């Protein structure tokens, strides 16, 4: 498994322990969907200003968000073999993750882990565009986080 990490913010430090949890989440998401670990994921940590700009540029939404996912695989994901294939890019605003961890009353690490898990399922072709799809995605996210004992503390 290749994780390409680009920390483009200077507001919050990211521990090695959190990086290891992120790797575990990525591997578990793929395993849960029946794929092996012959893949690459690009992960960028940014601040609110940068994610706001990216959200406006790529989604046409003029506000800060917590995470953006840029899948590189086609919609026919089931037909794609992951042989050293790049799944795509995940961009997380650590600044927003900290704000949300306070808002939801759990740890910063738990919030970042949730955002990575959420984004991984986007890279794997899932979306939350309907109530049914949202429910399916939430169940998958909770399964992965519970399996790795990443709780709301």
Swiss-Prot record:
Gene3D superfamilies: Metalloproteases ('zincins'), catalytic domain
GO biological process: one example: rRNA processing
The protein's Enzyme Commission number: 3.1.-.-
Required cofactor(s): Zn(2+)
Function: Single strand-specific metallo-endoribonuclease involved in late-stage 70S ribosome quality control and in maturation of the 3' terminus of the 16S rRNA.
Protein name, UniProt field: Endoribonuclease YbeY
Record keyword Transcription regulation present: no
Organism: Clostridioides difficile (strain 630) (Peptoclostridium difficile)
């Amino acid at each position: 498994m290749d994780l390409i990490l680009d920390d483009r913010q200077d507001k919050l430090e990211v521990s090695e322990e959190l990086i290891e949890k992120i790797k575990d989440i990525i591997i578990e998401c793929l395993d849960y969907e029946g794929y092996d670990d012959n893949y690459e994921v690009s992960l960028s940590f940014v601040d609110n200003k940068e994610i706001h700009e990216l959200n406006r540029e790529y989604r046409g939404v003029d506000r800060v968000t917590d995470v953006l996912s840029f899948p590189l695989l086609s919609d026919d994901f089931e037909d794609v073999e992951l042989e050293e294939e790049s799944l795509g890019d995940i961009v997380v605003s650590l600044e927003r993750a900290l704000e949300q961890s306070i808002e939801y009353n759990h740890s910063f690490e738990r919030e970042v882990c949730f955002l990575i898990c959420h984004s991984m399922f986007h890279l794997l072709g899932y979306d939350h565009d309907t109530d049914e799809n949202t429910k399916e995605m939430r169940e998958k996210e909770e399964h992965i986080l519970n399996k790795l004992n990443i709780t709301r503390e």
